[in-house]
A protein has these predicted regions:
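Intrinsically disordered, low-complexity regulatory segments
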Residues: 62, 85-88, 144-145, 152
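Histidine-bearing beta->alpha loop at or near hydrolase active sites
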Residues: 48, 73-98, 102-103, 120, ...
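Mg2+-dependent phosphoryl-transfer active-site scaffold
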Residues: 2-5, 61, 66-67
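Short hydrophobic alpha-helical runs that function as membrane-insertion/retention elements
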Residues: 68-72
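Short beta-strand/loop motif that positions the catalytic acidic residue
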Residues: 43-45, 49
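Glycine-/small-residue-rich active-site loops that bind phosphorylated ligands and cofactors
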Residues: 11, 49-52
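Alpha/beta-hydrolase
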Residues: 1-35, 39, 105, 110-154
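Short alpha-helix in the alpha/beta-hydrolase fold that links the catalytic acid
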Residues: 53-63, 74
Length: 154
């Protein structure tokens, strides 16, 4: 499939028809339903996101039965996610998820730094013990060089 077709299907299904929230979404012949999500979720939204307003992202909480950690990041659609630790970075968290985004915002605490740090702690609580990574490279796919790769170094 071409990327235009995929993008068109995504926008039509998720934005215009809101199929995912309504439990009517299909992907590659599989029915997708937010109500089927059981594992803990970490949802990040950006306060200045002009494409997905954070208040809309917050509404996800009402559609999943799973425990949710909702985090509001400084920045916009891209900068809110690619938000490395630094003097301008901040994020907000709350201990509970009240019914509305406005109530959440009133009870949330603002933290200096990147939401990445919060996510690392959250993920560590749910992860197993650290293990050594598997060896890289195979006979058919030999190692080309050390990471991150020549293309990154320019």
């Amino acid at each position: 499939m071409h990327s235009f077709y995929l993008r068109s299907c995504y926008l039509r299904s998720c934005y215009l028809e809101n199929r995912l929230v309504r439990g009517k979404m299909e992907l590659a012949g599989h029915h997708l339903d937010l109500a089927d999500i059981k594992q803990d979720l970490y949802i990040v939204a950006a306060i200045n996101d002009h494409i997905v307003p954070w208040t809309s992202s917050y509404m996800t909480i009402g559609h999943v039965p799973a425990p949710v950690r909702f985090v509001l990041s400084s920045g916009g659609h891209i900068a809110g996610i690619v938000n490395p630790p630094g003097p301008k970075a901040w994020y907000m968290t709350a201990e509970t998820n009240p019914p509305t985004a406005q109530e959440w915002h009133q009870t949330a605490t603002r933290h200096a730094g990147s939401w990445w740090e919060d996510w690392i702690s959250w993920a560590a609580e749910r992860a197993g013990p650290m293990v050594d990574p598997p060896p890289v490279g195979k006979r058919k796919y030999p190692v080309l060089g050390d990471g991150p790769g020549e293309y990154v170094r320019g």
